[in-house]
Amino acid sequence: MNIQFESAGVSFGARVALEPLTLAITGKRIGVIGLNGSGKTTFARLINGLTKPTTGRVIVNGRDTADEKTVVTDVGFIFQSPQNQIILPIVKDDIAFGLKRRGLSKAEIEARVEGVLARFGAEALADRRAHELSGGELQVAALCSVLATGPGILILDEPTNQLDLKNRALVERIIAGLPESAIVITHDLELIAGFERVLVFHEGRLAADEPAAEAIARYREIAA
């Protein structure tokens, strides 16, 4: 993971969503915490190109995300409500959907679908309908759909939100075992407690960039 923020900021008219930020992001696990409306999601959307900077630029693995010719295929995004990003009713069909747009052969698609499900021990989900899945199973299905396309960087937005203890533990194990670089946006402080680097956002600016223990302490000061 090599992400460079070069005085990158976002404004909507007079409202500043994210103050200009200069930051280098490398490594395997980055936590992102902050109160609602602090700029966390805007920060993440700049990385995958869903939001364009109004000042400065963001470079992901050597490519400017603001360039209209650039498709940020290096970045996969798991939204806070994974059921909303699963498009097709059957899990294996949804995983295949993103691969068909890559121009892969039928055999290649089938191999990737089987491979990504096996990676998470989720073969039993292949023929299940998305609306029948538990919260944890939905997270796994969404992860499979994104990871099948081969992104090197994964952004997870509130991955344990509204999960029971069993499904929360499942998602925690998956995140811990991901070989891909991961940026985890969360209010769940236990989830990022072991991370070497955590970013804290407050009122549209970066308030702290520290190891987890120090960053969590700073967040608690802000939230008090």
Curated annotation (Swiss-Prot):
Pfam families (alphabetical) = ABC_tran
Instruction: Please list the disulfide bridges.
Output: none
State the oligomer form and interacting partners: Part of a biotin transporter complex composed of BioM, BioN and BioY.
Question: Where does the ABC transporter domain lie?
Answer: 3-224
What InterPro entries does this protein's entry cite? AAA+_ATPase, ABC_transporter-like_ATP-bd, ABC_transporter-like_CS, ABC_transpr_CbiO/EcfA_su, ECF_ABC_transporter_ATP-bd, P-loop_NTPase
Q: Which residues bind ATP?
A: G34, L35, N36, G37, S38, G39, K40, T41
What's the protein's topology in the membrane? Answer: Peripheral membrane protein
Q: Which SMART domains match?
A: AAA (SM00382)
Compartment(s) of residence: Cell inner membrane
The domain of life for this entry's organism is: Bacteria
Annotated GO MF terms: ATP binding; ATP hydrolysis activity; ATPase-coupled transmembrane transporter activity
Q: Where are the transmembrane segments?
A: none
Q: Which species does the entry assign this protein to? A: Rhizobium etli (strain ATCC 51251 / DSM 11541 / JCM 21823 / NBRC 15573 / CFN 42)
Using the UniProt record, name the top-level EC class of this enzyme in a single word.
translocase
Which family does the similarity line name?
Belongs to the ABC transporter superfamily.
State the Gene3D superfamilies in the record.
Answer: P-loop containing nucleotide triphosphate hydrolases
Q: What does the UniProt record say this protein does?
A: Involved in biotin uptake.
**PROSITE patterns (UniProt xref):** ABC_TRANSPORTER_1, ABC_TRANSPORTER_2
What sections of the sequence does the record tag as coiled-coil? none
Q: What is this protein called?
A: Biotin transport ATP-binding protein BioM
List the EC numbers from the record: 7.6.2.-
> Gene Ontology cellular component?
ATP-binding cassette (ABC) transporter complex
Q: What induces it?
A: Expression is repressed by biotin.
Task: Give the gene name.
Answer: bioM
